[in-house]
Amino acid sequence: MSVHLYTSCWNEELIIPFFLRHYEPIVDRIVVYDDNSTDRTLELLAACPKVETRPLQRGAQSFLDAHLALFETCWQESRGEADWVCLADLDEFVFHPDWHAFLAAQKDDGVTIIASVGYDMVSESFPPAGAQLATTLTRGQRDFHLDKPSLFVPDAIDRVNHTVGRHCCSPTGQVVFAQKRYAQLRHYKSLGLEYLLARNHALASRLTEEDRARGWSGHYLNDDASIRAQFIKKLAQAETIPSPPRLPKAPKRSEKKHWWRRR
């Protein structure tokens, strides 16, 4: 079951090790569009043999407009090459404990697009190096605003037609959504207050006048006091998020002959 992942980044050196630890074992190819990172982002990505890094060309264009345009077309090169494509931001960990078997079962059922169930994850401090976030940092809250059509069959979908933020879409082609949603999208943005504040400040500095005028990503402009209050509230309300149900194991074939076949 071949899976190609497409993402974008800017100065993500802190989250990249966790991102690669999650996705490298479960996807076959990772294409990262870099928006002129100046930290160790490119160095860390280059160390992974599955990663191909490309420049994100956007000039003065709105950050969100550029990303919307990118993710409408970048995945099309995987037609005829991959069974599934996954579109995810660096802090979005699409998760199922039986990943390959789950995707194979979905494809056998004729499903061509999978909408992941969104969870806003939170931790009191930044996780230690080597942590497997999806299975060790498991406290958060259900957030339907984070639901996302993260996985689809490239040969079946003509256009995804995302809305801004890519949490909703109006796909065209052979569109068959899964009847039940088992894949999770665990959003690891709130990894300690210090990390959250620093990331908010950095991303706020990247918003263009067009972004601000449209009210896009306005949450990056919140003052530190309100961000701190929201973070404390998230910690207090967080609960352990259970893993999606595992797939039932296929029954073992009995070696014992039935009575009507015995001789």
Language-model segments: which ranges?
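Active-site beta-to-alpha loop of glycosyltransferases that engages the nucleotide-sugar donor
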Residues: V3, T7-R21, N36
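Short, acidic, metal-binding catalytic loop of nucleotide-sugar glycosyltransferases
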Residues: R21-R29
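Short beta-strand/loop segment that forms part of the nucleotide-sugar
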Residues: D28-N36, L56-Q57
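A conserved acidic beta->alpha catalytic loop
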Residues: D34-A47, A60
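Active-site-proximal specificity loops/subdomain of glycosyltransferases
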Residues: A46-L87
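Catalytic-site signature of metal-activated, phosphate-bearing donor transferases
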Residues: L64-E72, H96-R263
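Short acidic donor-binding/metal-coordinating loop in glycosyltransferase active sites
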Residues: D89-F93
